[in-house]
Amino acid sequence: MKVCLISAPTANQFDSRAVGETEAARIMGELAPVGILSLAAVLEAKGLQPQVVDLNRVYYSWLQDSNRDKASFCSFAGAYFAGRDFAGVDFFGFSTVCSSYPLTLRIAAEVKRAHPESAVVLGGPQASVVDISTLRAFPWIDLVVRGEAEQTLPELVDALTAGRSLAEIPGITFRGNGDGGIVRNPEAPLVADLDALPFPAFHLFPDVRFCRHFPLELGRGCPFSCTFCSTNDFFRRRFRLKSPAQMLADMRRVKQTYGISSFELVHDMFTVDRKRVVEFCEALLQSGEEFTWGSSARTDCVDEELIALMAKAGCRGIFFGIETGSRRMQKIIDKGLELNDSTERVRSCDKFKINTAVSLMAGFPDETMDDLRDTAAFFVDSLRYDHADPQLSILAPLAGTPIQTQYKDSLVLNDDVADMSYRGWQQEPQDHAMITAHPEIFSSFYAVPMPYLEREFLKELRDFLLCGMRAFRKLLLGLHQDSGNVVHVFQQWQEWRTRNGLHFSNGDRTAYYAQTSFPADFFRFVRLHYIPAASKAPLAMTALVEYETALLGRDHESDAVGDNPGQVSDSSSDDMEGLLSPDSRLQLRRGVNVITIPADYQEIVRRLRQRGPLHDIAEKPVKLAIRRTPAGPAEVRQLTPLSAELLGLCEEGLTVQEITGEFLLRNIEIPGVPPEKACLAGIEILRQQRLIALA
């Protein structure tokens, strides 16, 4: 039997078409579909040679097609599967997730149309929980494989090959023989020993060598029971980990085969078993090999000692699901975190330079404005830590979760759906009709009732915080600290924006907040309204808004600034070890900008990090050098008086001899250091900081 396994499409989940296209290379290079590659390896162990299709790669082929405006992605995918590469395929198995389930079903219909005699089968978390209703609603789906499929899939393929009855195969849902009834067999047993599973068939993924963060399954199952989460149901709350020896062997194999040593270790709750985490870290350290990795954890299942060990063993990223900043809501949703401890865990990760995703949600049925303020406060408070990346989504009632079950009869379809089910810019009317007709299948595209909050307010607050964090991180934190709560600032901003006629073009709120017009408008609001009318620390706020304005300007001018005759490219061939001669002519590097702000920037940042007072910041004009690099975030340096003078002279394109002469004329004195020596040393420091270079 010829088998084709197909990944769930995720590349359509962008805020806009433009974003989707620019993210293409990154997504293609980083997201190997490890789930279907693991199943492919199981089939290979049984002597089969499965095909693997990554629908994200098909999606990007469609983006590059000159005729894409004449055909939808679904039609393009249908034509792709109708091609000769799939002639003779007997079994098409689709992995599914909630966000792209409508699209997957429509592509499956195209496959069935092209291959009517082939079995079209669904698996994965979404199909597993809506198996019966899916088979009833969509006749082109033949079977659903529920839950973990490593045991079920080979048995199913064998039975279909031999024409045997499916009645004894655990973990499948299918149509009865001739009577149209749905048969749901008992659950398949969970995989008890994950070490016994074969190594995923990464050789079937053409872009595997381009993965920057290689996915490897670390374990399965979460023993907790949060009311909004579907993970515990899919894995039946059975927590399992691969052994440290097995994980180390897998990581070595990837490094030897593909030359990749950075890993995304896939597990929803790695740190539940502290002893096993310690064993894993110690095994990595004892190996003497340099691997970097990231995983997920609960903040109450780590402490600073464990975080330090994880960092030493190569951990560079942790996903923390905080969910809500409200103590009251922590209890209601059965998350049960102590939020002060959660903040400490984020701080500890920052201390050891571990990047943290701080995941938060809003839109719970019992959530009040006070609860929302607490969540927004936790979001912005996380910005104190350079290595923290807070996230904010709106609750999606996932099928089969306690929240969805409780509110299934009162769900409301929204045009602007929950983040976990973002449909993508190219959603077609067929998807909308499908979702509207079957709320029990597509519940994650609906919203739960919120008697205490307005949904439009919540959605705009989300966009404001997410886009504000990206555009003016320190100013957002400063406004939160100055006002007492960022939601108060947001409400003032809303009123000011409306009063000044700043309406969303075509009603597209998300597009407005994603564009450069938003920070420009917001900076005007801060200068013209917030600082004179509401700020307790006007000097600090003025310094921050001037800093963010300059920084934003460099972000959007970085591509053009290299054309400035007074600057040289940051990728210049200038030799950092070369000697300067008196005739060497110096210029600013590309992307370097010098600004003056009215207060000590370093002191403001220190107080923001430590939650110190901002109202007594003294007036002290300082110069900042902002250096934008092509591949990363801006570097900001507060200049000493000596560096500021020298950088100003370099802006004029003078030679070293001319700069030294001007330096002496200005009678700049450095105690205990001859002026000429101080000048040359200062020039070399600026050069090492990559602020200046030889012209």
Spans of model-derived segments:
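N-terminal [4Fe-4S]-dependent radical SAM core
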Residues: 1-2, 9-24, 169, 175-215
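C-terminal accessory regions of radical SAM enzymes
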Residues: 4, 9-26, 173, 370-524
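Radical SAM [4Fe-4S] cluster-binding motif and immediate context
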Residues: 31, 195-365, 370-377
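Glycine-rich beta-alpha loop elements in corrinoid/cobalamin-binding modules
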Residues: 35, 42-43, 49-190, 400
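Structural recognition of alpha->loop->beta junctions
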Residues: 134-151, 312-317, 374-392
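Long, charge-rich, low-complexity alpha-helical segments
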Residues: 503-576, 631-695
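A glycine-rich beta-turn/hairpin centered on an aromatic-Pro dipeptide
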Residues: 551-613
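Low-complexity, glycine/alanine/valine/leucine- and proline-rich hydrophobic stretches
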Residues: 595-648
